[in-house]
């Protein structure tokens, strides 16, 4: 392609991309990405001192390694977190909370069978550890085992019907089984809830009760500081991304998943699985490129 023609092609593509953006994105709602706090850094330094210099019992060392792993995870330092979790488990192999984190990491890596086993271990050690049902349900969802995912997420929803995100994850799974019935079920859950939490605004968008622009206006009005804005954006951008993905608009979905990640709310489920969504979209693109070359 000649340089001038190539320039025209790129310019046209950029113009079309700009036209396809929704109006509200002209005034995009953005937060300052969350950064480690001084308190978190001080706690990490103190933990390091205790682990290095004090004689600890095995239980104390395992617990401290777990707590440091959780802190590393919240800062996005997942390799360090995994190392601490593995060390804690080597000392005390009966820690359900450690298996839960390892199951999440295995899900993010696409190693679904191993993730199922990790979450099974959580529930064997502690049948009341309900977040393992959420995380196993999500792993089953990404693994394409929708009826089993529905069972787990239904049980997790029943534990707190007023939590909008439990309804949303259950809806995402039910949509894969029967889209029309999924909308009806989401509407019923919406009507039964007290709708006191921010996330019900996202449910209203999914049900067609409000527009995307109204959703973003509510988000901006509801945020009290940068932290709450970043958290709400992580949640909202992820579920908007899932919405556009269901419509086949992978480009918009990809942008929204990247915006989810950009807020640095590392310990939110939406941040974790936005990374997986991007990996899956990237794999689709790689597969398409390979097929074009054959």
UniProtKB/Swiss-Prot annotation:
Signal peptide: 1-18
Pfam families per the UniProt record, alphabetical: TPR_16, TPR_8
Biological-process GO terms, alphabetical: cell division; receptor-mediated virion attachment to host cell
SUPFAM superfamilies in the record: TPR-like
Topological category with respect to the lipid bilayer: Lipid-anchor
Lipidation (S-diacylglycerol cysteine): 19
Compartment list: Cell membrane
Keywords: Cell cycle, Cell division, Cell membrane, Lipoprotein, Membrane, Palmitate, Repeat, Signal, TPR repeat
InterPro entries: Lipoprotein_NlpI, TPR-like_helical_dom_sf, TPR_rpt, Ycf3
A single Gene Ontology CC term: cell outer membrane
N-palmitoyl cysteine: lipidated positions: 19
Residue windows of the TPR repeats: 62-95, 96-129, 234-267
NCBIfam families, per database record: PRK11189.1
Subunit details: Homodimer.
Reported function: May be involved in cell division. May play a role in bacterial septation or regulation of cell wall degradation during cell division.
UniProt name for this protein: Lipoprotein NlpI
Organism of provenance: Yersinia pestis bv. Antiqua (strain Antiqua)
Gene name as annotated: nlpI
């Amino acid at each position: 392609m000649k340089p001038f023609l190539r320039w025209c092609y790129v310019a046209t593509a950029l113009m079309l991309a700009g036209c396809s953006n929704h109006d509200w994105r002209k005034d995009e709602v953005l937060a300052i990405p969350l950064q480690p706090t001084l308190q978190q850094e001080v706690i990490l330094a103190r933990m390091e001192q205790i682990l290095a210099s004090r004689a600890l019992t095995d239980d104390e060392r395992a617990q401290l390694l777990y707590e440091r792993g959780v802190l590393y995870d919240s800062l996005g330092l997942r390799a360090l977190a995994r190392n601490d979790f593995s060390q804690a488990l080597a000392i005390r192999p009966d820690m359900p909370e450690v298996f839960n984190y390892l199951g999440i990491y295995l899900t993010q890596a696409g190693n679904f069978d191993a993730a199922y086993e990790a979450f099974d271990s959580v529930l064997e050690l502690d049948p009341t550890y309900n977040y393992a049902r959420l995380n196993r349900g999500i792993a089953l969802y990404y693994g394409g085992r929708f009826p089993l995912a529905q069972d787990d997420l239904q049980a997790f929803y029943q534990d707190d019907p007023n939590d909008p995100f439990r309804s949303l994850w259950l809806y995402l799974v039910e949509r894969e089984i029967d889209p029309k019935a999924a909308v009806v079920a989401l509407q019923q859950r919406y009507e039964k809830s007290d709708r006191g939490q921010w996330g019900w605004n996202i449910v209203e968008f999914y049900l067609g009760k409000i527009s995307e622009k109204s959703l973003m206006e509510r988000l901006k009005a509801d945020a009290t500081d940068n932290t709450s804005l970043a958290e709400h954006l992580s949640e909202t951008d992820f579920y908007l991304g899932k919405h556009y993905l269901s419509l086949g608009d992978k480009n918009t979905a990809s942008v929204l998943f990247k915006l989810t990640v950009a807020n640095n709310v590392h310990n939110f489920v939406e941040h974790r699985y936005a990374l997986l969504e991007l990996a899956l979209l990237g794999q689709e693109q790689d597969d398409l490129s390979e097929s074009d070359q054959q």
